[in-house]
Amino acid sequence: MEDSASASLSSAAATGTSTSTPAAPTARKQLDKEQVRKAVDALLTHCKSRKNNYGLLLNENESLFLMVVLWKIPSKELRVRLTLPHSIRSDSEDICLFTKDEPNSTPEKTEQFYRKLLNKHGIKTVSQIISLQTLKKEYKSYEAKLRLLSSFDFFLTDARIRRLLPSLIGRHFYQRKKVPVSVNLLSKNLSREINDCIGGTVLNISKSGSCSAIRIGHVGMQIEHIIENIVAVTKGLSEKLPEKWESVKLLFVKTEKSAALPIFSSFVSNWDEATKRSLLNKKKKEARRKRRERNFEKQKERKKKRQQARKTASVLSKDDVAPESGDTTVKKPESKKEQTPEHGKKKRGRGKAQVKATNESEDEIPQLVPIGKKTPANEKVEIQKHATGKKSPAKSPNPSTPRGKKRKALPASETPKAAESETPGKSPEKKPKIKEEAVKEKSPSLGKKDARQTPKKPEAKFFTTPSKSVRKASHTPKKWPKKPKVPQST
């Protein structure tokens, strides 16, 4: 029996393909009802043969689907809700309703309230009512959500809590295409609205592929009701799709476990005629894009040429300036700003000031002092040291002298007396001794000086930074008079 049923299904599919594809590529904008009738009849006979073979194991409410293949994959996901003249759900299907929590009431009271509301409008298809509070508490775990998903065939929800459901029910409802359909429970004609939601269908067009399926009925329905539902779906597609009916490529009818039988096919010529304007617009856009790219490349080449010309001009100007100037210094090429009269004046004034500063710094070259000689400034400092017995404050180094170099220190063995005993001919810059005596007479504190105090050695001056402290010179050890040696008597 099963072999004969499969043979009949294949023969029906062959007849369907032969009738659906005409010899000439004529535009078929309307659906052929005879072809739809043949395909549906073949599917029903196949399902009856399977029922006789497997007996009670067969599901009597096996669903029928209409497969839609589009010419182009859409850029965005599309969810189209369509109304059908005949209900596609049987009486044995379980339907669940999610409701809002009523104020100042428990979950049991809210369920009773909405059950009375449905009975008042004569609605008996809803099998269970679940409030939002019970959904949060009892169906929080992963296993509970899967159990809820498998226990019901269709889900309805109150329009007031529709935005709260995605975080509560999870992603599995959306993956298995069991998204709850929103209903306005406050409407006056509630029975009609709920029946339209239950009896209608939804087309989910994904952006991952060009093929999608729509539920159009079940095996227990009459053939005429199924055909009317298919015609209603095709009308809805021609209105809701982005490019209307021209975007439909193929239509098939199938069950969950059977082969797909074709009922409509379009041709490439029809698609080209329908999308002639769109193709022209695309060509124009591509031509504009290519023009922009060419212009951009031309601008890049012009910029490169300008930069190369500037570099060559600067090199040539350097080569011209070098032989003209007899000095070793090489003049730098003037920039564009220096070529203007205003900028040139400013640059000349600054250049003069810089030249003067460099000349002054060059004139102030520090003079080197020999080791054995002394300057008059050093003599004055030594005289004050002998008079007061205190060190003179350390002078900061001259800013004109370089800080990196150190001045040589005086020898440690040299005492002030030895320095004074030098001949005046060797040191022409020395002052006469008369001035030294006059300075001694003016300072009254010279007589109060302690005779036991030895004169301090002259400090070695280092050109260091002013922040560093100068080291103190070590005092010379006291010299005790030696006892004269008495010759031994023989």
From Swiss-Prot:
Induction comment: Down-regulated during cellular senescence.
Region Disordered, residue ranges: 1-33, 280-490
Phosphothreonine modification, residue list: 340, 358, 375, 415, 423, 465
Keyword check for Ubl conjugation: yes
Pfam families found in the cross-reference section: Ribosomal_L1
Modification type Phosphoserine: residues: 361, 392, 396, 427, 443, 469
Domain of life according to the entry: Eukaryota
Listed Basic residues bias regions: 280-293, 344-353, 469-490
Family: Belongs to the universal ribosomal protein uL1 family. Highly divergent.
Protein name per its UniProtKB record: Ribosomal L1 domain-containing protein 1
Organism (species): Homo sapiens
Taxonomic classification: Eukaryota, Metazoa, Chordata, Craniata, Vertebrata
Gene assigned in the entry: RSL1D1
